Amino acid sequence: MSHPPKLRLGVNVDHIATLRNARGGRAPDPVRAALLAIEAGADGITAHLREDRRHIRDDDMARLKAQISRPLNFEMAATEEMVRIALATKPHACCLVPERREELTTEGGLDVVGQHNALAPAIARLSEAGIRVSLFIAADPAQIEMAARLRAPVIEIHTGGWCDAITDGHHDKADAEWQRIVAGARQAYAAGLEVHAGHGLDYATAEQIAALPEIRELNIGYFIMGEALFVGLAESVRTMRAAMDRGRDRATGATA
């Protein structure tokens, strides 16, 4: 069977901004982290401008767009304010995510079935501006079907449930979540969607999911930044890249 294309790695720099904001000031700089990640092998940079600006700030997004040499993936809620900022920033891509002020991190996927009427105008405006829109959703058949109907070209499968089950030692749940991801990736690919994945991935889970030929990109931040405390950012990015490449070497099919 044919071999799928190289799997792209998007490195999320939100947690560099979290550390900076814990004390105030300008250091550590998420743009510097992005540049180092690209030098170490990242194919793109992801950053989430939340409504409460708890980590990434408006000027971070502007500087990332101006200074990095790889695609910028702008994570955002589908609000009027964020659409306006995205249209002004003109990133390569916007990933629409759910957002609640009380959450520590994005806890679930978008409910595109329940919110399709609100999402459709945002998707249309961003797409008309030449920005590639992705929807961060669970590997649920109804959500994937609606994502295709909304004509967003990309979905990002939320892998948090699978990763958490592995970490907690819940093997049956992990297996069930994994099968959902496999089925969801196949369904989305068959519907003509480009498939990305992210949330909670580490070296082992990134290597495993890299073997799914339908998946084109992984977006990973927290684990890479945590490992960077011990081995350095460049080394953690290189090790993640190597893990993904090992997994990809086991993938066959889905070459289009």
UniProtKB/Swiss-Prot annotation:
One Pfam match: PdxJ
Pathway(s) of this molecule: Cofactor biosynthesis; pyridoxine 5'-phosphate biosynthesis; pyridoxine 5'-phosphate from D-erythrose 4-phosphate: step 5/5
Positions marked as site (Transition state stabilizer): 156
Residues the record lists as binding 3-amino-2-oxopropyl phosphate: 12, 23, 200, 221-222
Localisation per UniProt entry: Cytoplasm
UniProt GO BP: pyridoxine biosynthetic process
Recorded catalytic activity of this chain's protein: 3-amino-2-oxopropyl phosphate + 1-deoxy-D-xylulose 5-phosphate = pyridoxine 5'-phosphate + phosphate + 2 H2O + H(+)
One annotated Gene Ontology cellular component of this protein: cytosol
Signal peptide residues on this chain, from the entry's feature table: none
Keyword list, A-Z: Cytoplasm, Pyridoxine biosynthesis, Transferase
Family (UniProt): Belongs to the PNP synthase family.
Full protein name: Pyridoxine 5'-phosphate synthase
Species the sequence originates in: Bradyrhizobium sp. (strain ORS 278)
